[in-house]
């Protein structure tokens, strides 16, 4: 049956235009506002010079796109783990969790997502639960596409324990250009699947470590949508 148009659907003029903008253009993460502001300030300061003005506007637009924070609708099925970020599934393998977490040194399933500079760089909670550990480790800034990035690059690890006792680890990894990891979580936080918890600036990688026996639902080469794509189902 056809849907009756709502009052919002019948608006016209400026109100209708603004409504379309709000539903089409994603909001920006607060961490990106200083970078957008810097580009606009450059454009304003160089308004008499078209090259400077253009460079400032391009920089502001590029940062607005990079720091975009699109709304997502996570699945409601219990026991699923969603992608913590947008990007390309680059590795699906078994690997030991980060050593700084002091967890048992035995391989567990790991899914790695590479984020290019064109992906949205906010990170999202992969599964609901409680944060039981947050550990930052300094390191290199090599290409995040390489397998060695998981071990060599700077990283920030978050361990989430579900209501059933399963532990899922999300690891933010800095890349060749990305040199600033932002994580808003602390130990003891209660988190909900799909919520935003941080970001990495300008190209990076996300590793998700899963319990043994987890049923992986993705393959290398597949595109992931943060907060929506199901990476795995817990045993």
Swiss-Prot record:
**Any one Gene Ontology biological process term?**
phosphatidylethanolamine biosynthetic process
According to the record's subunit comment, the protein's assembly and interactions are:
Heterodimer of a large membrane-associated beta subunit and a small pyruvoyl-containing alpha subunit.
Which pairs of Cys residues are joined through disulfide bonds in the record?
A: none
The catalysed reaction is: a 1,2-diacyl-sn-glycero-3-phospho-L-serine + H(+) = a 1,2-diacyl-sn-glycero-3-phosphoethanolamine + CO2
This protein is called Phosphatidylserine decarboxylase proenzyme
What does the record give as its pathway?
A: Phospholipid metabolism; phosphatidylethanolamine biosynthesis; phosphatidylethanolamine from CDP-diacylglycerol: step 2/2
Q: How does it sit in the membrane?
A: Peripheral membrane protein
**GO cellular component, as recorded:** plasma membrane
For this chain, the family text in UniProt reads: Belongs to the phosphatidylserine decarboxylase family. PSD-A subfamily.
The entry's localization annotation reads: Cell membrane
Which residues are recorded as modified (Pyruvic acid (Ser))?
Answer: 204
Q: Where is this site: Cleavage (non-hydrolytic)?
A: 203-204
Co-factor remark: Binds 1 pyruvoyl group covalently per subunit.
* Positions of the catalytic residues: 204
| Biological function | Catalyzes the formation of phosphatidylethanolamine (PtdEtn) from phosphatidylserine (PtdSer).
Q: Which NCBIfam families match?
A: PRK05305.1-3 (NF003679)
Q: Which species is listed as the source? A: Mycobacterium sp. (strain KMS)
Q: What is its EC number?
A: 4.1.1.65
| GO MF term set | phosphatidylserine decarboxylase activity
The post-translation modification note in this UniProt entry reads: Is synthesized initially as an inactive proenzyme. Formation of the active enzyme involves a self-maturation process in which the active site pyruvoyl group is generated from an internal serine residue via an autocatalytic post-translational modification. Two non-identical subunits are generated from the proenzyme in this reaction, and the pyruvate is formed at the N-terminus of the alpha chain, which is derived from the carboxyl end of the proenzyme.
Q: Which metal ions or organic cofactors does this protein require, according to UniProt?
A: pyruvate
Instruction: Extract the InterPro entries matched here.
Output: PS_Dcarbxylase, PSD-A
The UniProt keywords, alphabetically, are: Cell membrane, Decarboxylase, Lipid biosynthesis, Lipid metabolism, Lyase, Membrane, Phospholipid biosynthesis, Phospholipid metabolism, Pyruvate, Zymogen
């Amino acid at each position: 049956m056809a849907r009756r148009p709502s009052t919002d659907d019948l608006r016209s003029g400026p109100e209708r235009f603004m409504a379309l903008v709000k539903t089409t253009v994603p909001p920006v993460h607060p961490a990106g506002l200083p970078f957008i502001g810097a580009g606009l300030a450059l454009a304003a300061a160089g308004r008499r010079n078209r090259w400077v003005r253009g460079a400032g506007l391009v920089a502001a637009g590029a940062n607005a796109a990079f720091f975009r924070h699109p709304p997502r609708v996570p699945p409601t099925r219990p026991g699923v783990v969603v992608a913590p970020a947008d990007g390309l599934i680059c590795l699906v393998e078994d690997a030991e969790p980060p050593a700084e977490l002091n967890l048992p040194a035995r391989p567990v399933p790991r899914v790695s997502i590479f984020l290019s500079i064109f992906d949205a760089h906010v990170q999202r909670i992969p599964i609901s639960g409680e944060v039981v550990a947050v550990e930052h480790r300094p390191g290199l800034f090599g290409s995040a596409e390489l397998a060695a990035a998981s071990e060599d690059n700077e990283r920030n690890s978050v361990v989430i324990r579900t209501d059933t006792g399963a532990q899922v680890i999300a690891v933010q990894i800095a890349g060749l250009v990305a040199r600033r990891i932002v994580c808003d979580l602390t130990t003891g936080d209660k988190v909900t699947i799909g919520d935003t918890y941080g970001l990495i600036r300008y190209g990076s990688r996300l590793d998700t470590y899963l319990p043994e026996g987890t049923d992986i639902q993705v393959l290398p080469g597949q595109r992931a949508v943060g907060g929506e794509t199901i990476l795995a189902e817990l045993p």
